[in-house]
């Protein structure tokens, strides 16, 4: 990575404004999944050990520019203190006199959590005045919020106009892993693209067709490709306005020598529920009033075989409606194949794929699970991320 990280700067005694991603799911004031807090710990601990005054900023939920009581970061600060085993202070605002006083009272190695930055309308507008207010609290800006790196907001990008800007350790790892995958992949390189909609994955498929050896398609978006081949798909998801594009992608794969894998059999159902009756049919045999909801067993075997023989696999998007037990087997099989593959480096591209490997207890078997769904998607589309572009070059 050609951007400076916290390892490249002197931090002792410095006030560090560190943008983290503490956007954790909450239920009745309790954190239901603390993965993102844990992911930020190495950076926070490094800053503490180096004798920095650590000022943490994050968003939580979508308060839309005003204070919302249940979206305060108070429970997050409390949990962070437990995880760090030290006292963590919490400010009730993200800038201004109260925050400044609390920062002024900090000693080296102290940690302070600012209030939810999205309580201020200027945050999502990347307002220069708000960015200046944030910058006034600190000497250095650290961006460790890969999950928000595709956003040009005041605390993720704007602040870098007023302070030296470097990446945290999590951001650095994300950029290294994803960057290496796209620029210098070990081969065979396989991408698995799933999820519901073709339109969400157009950029990724287009960009990856230039880079991969194998492209595996699954999830709801597969049926648009199936229909493009002339098959009936019953009531399965389909984007009729993307059929020509699907044909174009399949033609491109052929021209570029990319192996393009699609389901050969599918799990179908007449009702969308936990207790649904399902059948397995060939891809060209979906009855008119049934819908495809998962990849079938033959497809799972083919996909698992491709995975096993790959050196690098990037997975973005589930193979079926994995949240419901009868439609989860395809996604589980792909996860299991990645978990079992001995010589394969597996990169899970955040979002639903990450949720799936967590749900099936396979997370510790994956080489890298990205902490940013939208950010990793845009990175894989070859787009520049505002929260990365703004960092100082080495």
From Swiss-Prot:
It is found in: Cytoplasm. The keyword Cytoplasm applies. Its EC number is 2.7.2.3. Disulfide bonds: none annotated. Pathway: Carbohydrate degradation; glycolysis; pyruvate from D-glyceraldehyde 3-phosphate: step 2/5. It is an enzyme of class 2 (transferase). Its main location: cytoplasm. InterPro entries: Phosphoglycerate_kinase, Phosphoglycerate_kinase_CS, Phosphoglycerate_kinase_N, Phosphoglycerate_kinase_sf. GO terms for cellular component: cytosol. GO terms for molecular function: ADP binding; ATP binding; phosphoglycerate kinase activity. The modification Phosphoserine is found at residue 183. The modification Phosphothreonine is found at residue 299. One of its GO terms (biological process) is glycolytic process. ATP binds at residues 201, 292, 323, 350-353. Substrate binds at residues 21-23, 36, 59-62, 118, 151. Monomer. This is Phosphoglycerate kinase. It comes from Bacillus cereus (strain G9842).
């Amino acid at each position: 990575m050609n951007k400076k990280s916290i390892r490249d700067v002197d931090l002792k005694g410095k006030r560090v404004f560190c943008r983290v991603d503490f956007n954790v799911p909450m239920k009745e004031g309790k954190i239901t999944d603390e993965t993102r807090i844990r992911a930020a710990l190495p950076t926070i601990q490094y800053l503490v050990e180096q004798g920095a005054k650590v000022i943490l900023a994050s968003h939580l939920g979508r308060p839309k520019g005003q204070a919302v009581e249940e979206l305060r970061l108070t429970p997050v600060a409390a949990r962070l203190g437990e995880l760090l085993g030290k006292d963590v202070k919490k400010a009730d605002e993200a800038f201004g006199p109260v925050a400044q006083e609390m920062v002024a009272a900090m000693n080296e190695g102290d940690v302070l959590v600012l209030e939810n930055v999205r309580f201020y309308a200027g945050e999502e507008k990347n307002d220069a005045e708000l960015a200046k207010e944030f910058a006034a609290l600190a000497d250095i800006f650290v961006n460790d919020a890969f999950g928000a790196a595709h956003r040009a907001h005041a605390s993720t990008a704007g602040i870098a106009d007023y302070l030296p800007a470097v990446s945290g350790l999590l951001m650095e790892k994300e950029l290294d892993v994803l960057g290496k995958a796209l620029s210098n992949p070990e081969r065979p390189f396989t991408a698995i693209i799933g999820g519901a909609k073709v339109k969400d994955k157009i950029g990724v498929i287009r960009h990856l067709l230039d880079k991969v050896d194998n492209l595996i398609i699954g999830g709801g978006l597969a049926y648009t490709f199936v229909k493009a081949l002339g098959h009936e798909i019953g009531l399965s998801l389909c984007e009729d306005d993307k059929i020509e594009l699907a044909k174009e992608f399949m033609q491109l794969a052929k021209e570029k020598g990319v192996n393009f894998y699609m389901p050969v059999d599918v799990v179908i159902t007449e009702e969308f529920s936990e207790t649904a009756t399902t059948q397995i049919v060939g891809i060209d045999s979906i009855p008119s009033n049934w819908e495809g909801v998962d990849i079938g067993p033959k497809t799972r075997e083919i996909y698992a075989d491709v995975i096993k023989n790959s050196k690098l696999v990037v997975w973005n998007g589930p193979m079926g409606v994995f949240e419901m037990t009868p439609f989860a087997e395809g996604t589980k099989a792909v996860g299991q194949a990645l978990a079992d593959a001995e010589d394969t480096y597996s990169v899970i591209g955040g979002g639903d794929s990450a949720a799936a490997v967590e749900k099936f207890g396979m997370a510790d078997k994956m080489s890298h699970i990205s902490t940013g769904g939208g950010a990793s998607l845009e990175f894989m589309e070859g787009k520049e991320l505002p929260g990365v572009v703004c960092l100082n070059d080495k």
